[in-house]
Amino acid sequence: MQKRLASEQKNVLNARSRITRSGQPIMNTLFQPYRLNDTLTLANRFMMAPLTRCMAGPGLVPTEQMAAYYGRRADIGLIVSEAVIIRPDAQGYPNTPGLFTQAQIDGWKKVTSAVHAKGGKIFAQLWHVGRLSHPFFHQAEVLAPSAVAHEGTVPRMRELTYQVPRALTEAEIAQLVQDYATAGANAIEAGFDGVEIHGANGYLIDQFLHHSTNLRSDNYGGCPENMSRFALEVVDAISARIGGDRVGIRLSPGAYVHLAGSPEDRAVFDYLLGKLNDRPLAYIHLGIFDDNLTFDYLGGRASDYLRAHYKGNLVGVGNYDAERAAAAIEANRFDLVAIGRPLIANPDYLTKVKKGEALVPYADTMLAELV
């Protein structure tokens, strides 16, 4: 059951006029450097959320326009790239960039160079859509934890209906783990500062973590330990290649898109987060569109659940403006805030927020080009 926290909207105070315990304006907190770990210090507490733009060139190679697009946003503390597919059958949307060929790696080098030239940092978000793929993209089977189809049609290609996937074998799961690790190494070769594992929003890793999409009875299903196994194997394999301090993961303990949640899912995420606490990750990034949503089986907001169960860096997201984000950080609800659509509409988002200038409202028509 999902409900809106309407009272929070009513009770938010103007953070620009509020003072922290140290006597500084709350908004100043957002613009101070933030130390993720011994390896990475960010210029500020803003992150650019991963935003699928479907603008890759032939061969799913990043373009010069993409390099310029990310470069214009390099003042954000950490950019997380649009989701990047780790192998051909990972694709579920048209023209989404890959990170499994040398041409793709070389294309991303232009992107990372554009960001680094302006002093920024950028992670690649590693992605496999699982049952949300379609043979149209790769002329191969659709693979998932279990043979449970997603109802509906493929976004931006509504003539394509989702198909019943084939359940992965354990040998195929082992290969996927290695493919994630290879993508992580490719990201470092391409100049990324690290990677974010996409384990949220109903895609492949998330499908293993929810009972509605994981009906397995082998080593990857049936109990919290087994249902968490794939996610942890991916984390460990990538960390072994590039270092855990350069690895973040995005999670959706509250199922809100592409799959259904159930009370039994709570035990899976309790177990998973306990194990992630033992690993030196850069951060966990909440996956949700609106952090006012609450989930009965989590006891409230997904962000509050993650804060209570994970001791490392937490990235909040979900319809936050700078003032609400600053207040939430001051209240220790999370450590950094990811901004999504406002950064599509405002490449100069950080400058405008600093100056208190009005932001250009986001509109879907803006998705037609990279500005």
Language-model regions: role of each:
Residues 4, 10, 19-371:
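Flavin-dependent oxidoreductase catalytic cores
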